[in-house]
From Swiss-Prot:
Residue ranges of the TM segments: 164-184
PTM remark: Ubiquitinated by PRKN during mitophagy, leading to its degradation and enhancement of mitophagy. Deubiquitinated by USP30.
UniProt keyword annotation of Iron present: no
Gene Ontology cellular component annotations, sorted alphabetically: cytoplasm; SAM complex
Provenance organism: Sus scrofa
Alphabetic keyword roster: Isopeptide bond, Membrane, Mitochondrion, Mitochondrion outer membrane, Protein transport, Transmembrane, Transmembrane helix, Transport, Ubl conjugation
GO biological process, one term: mitochondrion organization
Function: Involved in transport of proteins into the mitochondrion. Essential for embryonic development.
Cross-linked sites for Glycyl lysine isopeptide (Lys-Gly) (interchain with G-Cter in ubiquitin): K38, K41, K78
Name the UniProt record assigns to this protein: Metaxin-1
Family: Belongs to the metaxin family.
Chief subcellular location: mitochondrion
Subunit structure: Interacts with MTX2/metaxin-2. Associates with the mitochondrial contact site and cristae organizing system (MICOS) complex, composed of at least MICOS10/MIC10, CHCHD3/MIC19, CHCHD6/MIC25, APOOL/MIC27, IMMT/MIC60, APOO/MIC23/MIC26 and QIL1/MIC13. This complex was also known under the names MINOS or MitOS complex. The MICOS complex associates with mitochondrial outer membrane proteins SAMM50, MTX1 and MTX2 (together described as components of the mitochondrial outer membrane sorting assembly machinery (SAM) complex) and DNAJC11, mitochondrial inner membrane protein TMEM11 and with HSPA9.
Protein localization: Mitochondrion outer membrane
């Protein structure tokens, strides 16, 4: 019997099954098609077989870590949400996917990873609370830098004095994109009628993050909430396909050890690497900042038997 397909993705929060755009899109597509996946919702990307999220381990043991390639593999396995689409609808899917990436993705990155208030009070807060120590000290900042580099690739190089004008232009285009999506959806349940397609999985992942997150700076969020059919569309998909998921982020300290072992066979190795990386980072910071200094000391006496016993007990704990 073939091993089950396994999906590793970011865990849920804000009332969503995942707080990550790509993870949410893949999860939603899998629900639409009924693909039999063993889902591991985690908050440590090092526990993924690829080191990134989302990632799919196929029945043959191959690891796929690009969302579009994951969906392509599910289609090859006969889980195809676009099977009944016409050629015209297939072309519309490609056009709207391109529109999402060009007009909505840059503003979504800016909203969650560049806007200072949103990043500090919402994005970094969630990841810092969700991630295990010591990853929560440095990984959110690294992720922010990666998203800022991605935004630069999407928008191109700009001088600092042009940034304010560029931001206005990006948000205006994103508002127009949302309005166009609202007009295209109309009163339908999904973009191509009564059954969801791959386009719905991606549109939902973009809109649901904007709708559900409690953003202190929500310029685009306010526009979305004025488009009532898009809001109802998100609520409908959440209630129909994710009725019991996404309420709270799991706390690393409260996760049962057996559950972690069940989810990821590399847990012990990654824990050791995480601790070593964190200790090295903290030691380096302490030395560079002068908190700790290295001085010569006279030879110390050998510790008593009692002291050795206490040290061993501390290590075992």
């Amino acid at each position: 019997m073939a091993a089950p397909m396994e999906l590793f993705c970011w865990s849920g929060g804000w009332g969503l099954p995942s707080v990550d755009l790509d993870s949410l899109a893949v999860l939603t597509y899998a629900r639409f098609t009924g693909a039999p996946l063993k889902v591991h919702k985690i908050t440590n990307p090092w526990r993924s077989p690829s080191g990134t999220l989302p990632a799919l381990r196929t029945s043959q043991g191959e690891v796929i870590s690009v969302p579009h390639k994951i969906i392509t593999h599910l289609r090859k396995e006969k889980y195809n949400a676009d099977y009944d689409l016409s050629a015209r609808q297939g072309a519309d899917t490609l056009a709207f996917m391109s529109l999402l990436e060009e007009k909505l993705l840059p503003v979504l990155i800016h909203t969650f990873w560049v806007d200072a208030k949103n990043y500090v009070e919402v994005t970094r807060k969630w990841y810092a609370e969700a991630m295990p120590f010591p990853l929560n000290f440095f990984l959110p900042g690294r992720m922010q830098r990666q998203y800022m580099e991605r935004l630069q690739l999407l928008c191109g190089e700009h001088r600092p004095e042009e940034e304010e004008e560029l931001e206005k232009e990006l948000y205006q285009e994103a508002r127009e994109c949302l309005t166009l999506l609202s007009q295209r959806l109309g009163a339908q349940k999904f973009f191509f009628g009564d059954a969801p397609a791959s386009l719905d999985a991606f549109v939902f992942s973009y809109l649901a993050l904007l709708q559900q997150a409690k953003l202190p700076s929500g310029k685009l969020q306010a526009h979305l909430r004025g488009l009532h059919n898009l809001c109802a569309y998100c609520t409908h998909i959440l209630s129909l396909y994710f009725p019991w998921e996404g309420a709270e982020v799991p706390r690393p300290r409260q996760t049962p050890a057996s559950s972690e072992t069940e989810e990821e066979p590399y847990r012990r190795r990654n824990q050791i690497l995480s601790v070593l990386a964190g200790l090295a980072a903290m030691a380096g910071y302490a030395l560079l900042s002068g908190i700790v200094s290295i001085q010569r000391a006279p030879p110390a006496r050998a510790p008593s038997t009692r002291a050795l016993g206490m040290a061993e007990e501390d290590e075992e704990e």
